[in-house]
Amino acid sequence: MLFEGLELVSALATLAACLVSVTLLLAVSQQLWQLRWAATRDKSCKLPIPKGSMGFPLIGETGHWLLQGSGFQSSRREKYGNVFKTHLLGRPLIRVTGAENVRKILLGEHQLVSTEWPRSARVLLGPNTVANSIGDIHRNKRKVFSKIFSHEALESYLPKIQLVIQDTLRAWSSQPEAINVYQEAQRLTFRMAVRVLLGFSIPEEDLGNLFEVYQQFVENVFSLPVDLPFSGYRRGIQARQILQKGLEKAIREKLQCTQGKDYSDALDILIESSKEHGKEMTMQELKDGTLELIFAAYATTASASTSLIMQLLKHPAVLEKLREELRAQGLLHGGGCPCEGTLRLDMLSGLRYLDCVIKEVMRLFTPVSGGYRTVLQTFELDGFQIPKGWSVMYSIRDTHDTAPVFKDVNVFDPDRFSQARSEDKDGRFHYLPFGGGVRTCLGKHLAKLFLKVLAVELASTSRFELATRTFPRITLVPVLHPVDGLSVKFFGLDSNQNEILPETEAMLSATV
């Protein structure tokens, strides 16, 4: 018994020694990791590097960021201020909040900073995209792509977008069970991007398969750039390869078939615009361009669409006020008689309260956290040096949350954007859901158009209710969305705002 007791004590002592050694090793390695990045400060500048933590060697604070969500930024902002350092997705990073700080970064493009997304995003989106280009190449690409989002182009997309949304809402209402709004919003925006924006005639089964692959692609755009079996980065690369093959097939089929078209889609405009600027696009450039267009139209718009539905659920008075505006303009048409082309751009621009609702959704629930830049030369920000070679991420969502121009920032209040209040009129960098400067989101007008049409159709044709006891919490990666997707039951409404019976709904669906 004595020897057995001694053996147990010895084993426990060995285990304790191992734990102490591991703890010390982690502490020492973490301290060396901090010193390694502290040594990169620009010694010619007397200002200190921003405060913050670089986390653990190699992985930095990526784990904390993924687990804490919005709490990651807010907790560190409270501890370190509006400018702090961290290490995310395999790179050192300085995160920046506040209108004046963000303004300096956005207006310093090409002089102080240059765009550089995390390595995973650069590789997966491809080298020929607008997002990954810089300097003159970026300027030229924006000129080519800008025609896709012109007023004339948006007017031509509008009837098709409205029809896709009408069909989708009718399908949602015909479901006997609640739907996962975020997942279905992704399907909707993917269908809109592929069928309407790009004009691809992909069979329904192939479209469904392509959607599943695209989900895998989007989920891993922001991942640790470690190319190992079963890693998110590897899954993203595999998804990109499958998508590129599918897109090439669709592009070739589309280029060979020019009959029966009643409008110019984005791919037509892109090809024509590139020719006008003296450069015919290669197949690889077309594949990267279409992949970027789908990415831009898909993930962020699905996020904003889900947020719109959730806020209309939470605030029935807002939905009723929206219906009153539509009724006054003769646009509360009901779902009993679906038709294409009842909306025009001038009609939508005249709906002031609708515009306020969309603006407030984008303020409070901005789909993306911010934008990435690489520092070209050391500069000062909020009393700190931002060293050359470091990466900077300006935070859109946190700038909205801390903007002094907005009253009760956590309250969903569309009227803050009304003409009577115009809380956003003082300083354009307090409100920037689509970024700013020379890299303002090219597709912002298409995104707002889609959200407005969705809101009009929701108010006109649907009654919807939350299928769970409470609203879900929100996560931020890869874009803002509810953790459970938001479970909602939809019911169709007729032209008198009366609920359509299930058998009538089935008959309507069968005729479409």
From Swiss-Prot:
GO biological process terms, semicolon-separated: bone morphogenesis; cell fate determination; cellular response to retinoic acid; central nervous system development; cornification; embryonic limb morphogenesis; establishment of skin barrier; establishment of T cell polarity
GO cellular component: cytoplasm; endoplasmic reticulum membrane
Catalyzed reactions: all-trans-retinoate + reduced [NADPH--hemoprotein reductase] + O2 = all-trans-4-hydroxyretinoate + oxidized [NADPH--hemoprotein reductase] + H2O + H(+); all-trans-retinoate + reduced [NADPH--hemoprotein reductase] + O2 = all-trans-18-hydroxyretinoate + oxidized [NADPH--hemoprotein reductase] + H2O + H(+)
Primary site of residence: endoplasmic reticulum
Membrane topology: Peripheral membrane protein
Cofactor(s) required for function per UniProt: heme
Name of the protein this chain belongs to: Cytochrome P450 26B1
Species of origin: Rattus norvegicus
Upper taxonomic lineage: Eukaryota, Metazoa, Chordata, Craniata, Vertebrata
